[in-house]
Curated annotation (Swiss-Prot):
This is Formate-dependent phosphoribosylglycinamide formyltransferase. ATP binds at residues 114, 155, 160-165, 195-198, 203. GO terms for cellular component: cytosol. The lineage of its organism: Bacteria, Pseudomonadati, Pseudomonadota, Gammaproteobacteria, Pseudomonadales. Homodimer.
C-alpha cells in the first residue's frame, strides 16, 4: 500500500525531477495535490516546474557527477526524468544502487538515443517501422539517402522537438540537411538516422500508462507538426477499429519492453488499417497537453498516480477536445500576455501560460485548450483562443 508522508518532514515522500519544463510543471502540481515533497532540477534558473516545487537545483544534467551529487544529497524516493538530455549512464548506476527511476533507467537511456529505441522496436520486437539507416559520416549519410530514395527524413540520433530534423525532397537538400542535423543534435555533431518517408494518412500519440493495475490507453491523440515541432493536437482522433487495435498492440509491446511504471507517449504513423512505430517518450508527451481539458485525469495526473503506485480504475474522456500552442518569437526576459479576456471568452476554453523566464528566438510559451461538439470545431476554437493572446516582449 502507498503511504504518503508530510512534506518537509522525516516522513516526506520525495520526488526529484530531472528537467523542469512545462510538462514537468503539471506533474509537480499533481504531486503537490497529493502532499508529495518535490525537488526540481534543470540547467537554468526559474524553469516552469521549479516555480511550483518545494526547492530546486541548477546543474548541467549531462554532467554525471553533478547529477549524482544532487540525488545523493536529496535522497528522493523517486527520480523522474522529464527530458532526454540527462546523464542516463548515471541513472543506470543509481538505479543499481537502489534508487527508483521512473519508469526505469533503461527506458531513459534507450529513448535518449533514437538508435537504441529504433533497434529495440524494429530488430528485437519486430514491430513495423519506416526503413532506416544510421550514419556517422557525410559519405555514409549520402549512401543512406541514395539507398532509401526521396523523399526521406534525416534526424540527429540525439535531439528533441524536431531540432536538426529535415525532410529531403531532392538531391539539392542533401548537404543542407546534413549541416542542419549536425547543428541540431543535443550532444553536438554526430550520428544521424535517415528514414524512408512513410506516406501516412495521419500520425497519433497513444498515451499509454503502466500502473499498479496493468496498462491503460488514453483515447488516441491526433496532432499536427511543423518541422517536427507540435503545433496543435486533438482527442479523440478518429481511427478504424483495426488500426486502433494494432496501435494498442504496438504501444503495449514497446512499453512492456521498457518496463517500470508511468506515462509513455507512443508516436505512430497510420495509413488506413496499417500502423508503423515512430518514437516513444517514457514520460508525458507535449501533444498530450490536450488531456488537461479532454480527460478527468490528465496525462500528468495519470503519471503522478503511476509513480506513486496508486490505482487508475478508469479514464473518462469528455469528447472532442483540442490544444493549440502559443508560440512566441523574439527576445525577452519579461514576456507579458494580454487580451486574455478575449482568449477565454468562449465556453469550454482554458489557457496554460508556462511562466518560462525568457524567450530567445522561437519558444512555446503557453497553450490554449478547448472542447466542442466536433474535433473540427474544437480545433478551430483552440486556435482562436491561442491567436487572441496578445504577446508583449
Amino acid at each position: 500500500m502507498t503511504q504518503i508522508g508530510t512534506p518537509l518532514s522525516p516522513t516526506a515522500t520525495r520526488v526529484l525531477f530531472c528537467g523542469s519544463g512545462e510538462l514537468g510543471k503539471e506533474v509537480v502540481i499533481e504531486l503537490q495535490r497529493l502532499g508529495v515533497e518535490v525537488i526540481a532540477v534543470d540547467r537554468y534558473e526559474n524553469a516552469p516546474a521549479m516555480q511550483v516545487a518545494h526547492r530546486s537545483h541548477v546543474i548541467n544534467m549531462l554532467d554525471g557527477a553533478a547529477l549524482r551529487a544532487v540525488i545523493e544529497a536529496e535522497k528522493p524516493d523517486f527520480i523522474v526524468p522529464e527530458i532526454e538530455a540527462i546523464a542516463t549512464a548515471t541513472l543506470v548506476e543509481l538505479e543499481a544502487e537502489g534508487f527508483t527511476v521512473i519508469p526505469t533507467a533503461r527506458a531513459a537511456q534507450l529513448t535518449m538515443n533514437r538508435e537504441g529505441i529504433r533497434r529495440l522496436a524494429a530488430e528485437e520486437l519486430k514491430l513495423p517501422t519506416s526503413p532506416y539507416h544510421f550514419a556517422d559520416t557525410f559519405e555514409a549519410y549520402s549512401k543512406a539517402v541514395e539507398d532509401l530514395g526521396f523523399p526521406c527524413v534525416v534526424k540527429p540520433v540525439m535531439s528533441s522537438s524536431g531540432k536538426g530534423q529535415s525532410l529531403l525532397k531532392s538531391a539539392d537538400d542533401v548537404q543542407k540537411a546534413w549541416d542542419y542535423a549536425q547543428e541540431g543534435g543535443r550532444a553536438g555533431k554526430g550520428r544521424v538516422i535517415v528514414e524512408g518517408f512513410i506516406d501516412f494518412d495521419y500520425e497519433i500519440t497513444l498515451l499509454t500508462v503502466r500502473h499498479i493495475g496493468g496498462t491503460t490507453f488514453c483515447a488516441p491523440v491526433g496532432h499536427r507538426q511543423e518541422k517536427g515541432d507540435y503545433q496543435e493536437s486533438w482527442q479523440p482522433q478518429a481511427m478504424s477499429p483495426v488500426a486502433l487495435a494494432e496501435s494498442e498492440r504496438v504501444a503495449r509491446a514497446v512499453t512492456e519492453a521498457l518496463g517500470g511504471r508511468g506515462m509513455f507517449g507512443v508516436e505512430l504513423f497510420i495509413k488506413g488499417d496499417q500502423v508503423w512505430f515512430s518514437e516513444v517518450s517514457p514520460r508525458p508527451h507535449d501533444t498530450g497537453l490536450v488531456t488537461l481539458i479532454s480527460q478527468d485525469l490528465s496525462q500528468f495526473a495519470l503519471h503522478a498516480r503511476a509513480i506513486l503506485g496508486l490505482p487508475i480504475p478508469l479514464i473518462r474522456q469528455f469528447g472532442p477536445s483540442a490544444s493549440a500552442v502559443i508560440l512566441v518569437e523574439g527576445q525577452s526576459t519579461q514576456t507579458a500576455f494580454a487580451n486574455l479576456g478575449a482568449a477565454l471568452a468562449e465556453p469550454d476554453t482554458a489557457l496554460r501560460l508556462f511562466g518560462k523566464p525568457e524567450v530567445n528566438g522561437q519558444r512555446r510559451m503557453g497553450v490554449a485548450l478547448a472542447r466542442d461538439e466536433s474535433i473540427e470545431a474544437a480545433r478551430a476554437k483552440a486556435t482562436r483562443a491561442s491567436q487572441a493572446v496578445d504577446v508583449k516582449l
